[in-house]
Curated annotation (Swiss-Prot):
Residue ranges constituting the Cystatin domain according to the UniProt record: 30-89
Organism, as annotated: Actinidia chinensis var. chinensis
Name of the molecule in the record: Cysteine proteinase inhibitor 1
Localisation: Secreted
Gene: CYT1
GO molecular function: cysteine-type endopeptidase inhibitor activity
Chain location of the short sequence motif Secondary area of contact per the record: 73-77
Cellular-component GO terms for this entry: extracellular region
Main location: secreted
């Protein structure tokens, strides 16, 4: 039999942990989370990198305009999935870019880039 003070402590800890977990938004491990501030310097930097890298790889001349929406996913670093408005000549279109970022290694890779 567990002593009464220890039982009360365990019950209190269980109730506290349930309250903490219940108050959080649940996102599956490795799931995509919406980016709250699309205008942050970090998001803008990743978006501009995506357009610049696409231009190098595809010999294109898109001009970055803005981030329309975006999501992050924690992996061995961070994946950014961004919908970017970019100008192709006089026409503005939306493009989806996925960028893998590991800032502590000064590593950034454009995983995909496509018109949406």
């Amino acid at each position: 039999m567990v002593p009464k003070p220890l039982s009360l402590l365990l019950l209190l800890l269980l109730a506290l942990s349930a309250a903490v977990v219940g108050g959080r938004k649940r996102v599956a491990a490795g799931g995509w989370r919406p980016i709250e501030n699309l205008n942050s310097a970090e998001v803008q930097d990743v978006a501009q990198f995506a357009v610049s890298e696409h231009n190098k790889q595809a010999n294109d001349e898109l001009q970055y305009q803005s981030v329309v929406r975006g999501y992050t996913q924690v992996v061995a670093g961070t994946n950014y999935r961004l919908v970017i408005a970019a100008k192709d000549g006089a026409v503005v279109g939306n493009y989806e870019a996925v960028v893998w970022d590991k800032p502590w290694m000064h590593f950034r890779n454009l995983t995909s880039f496509r018109k949406v």
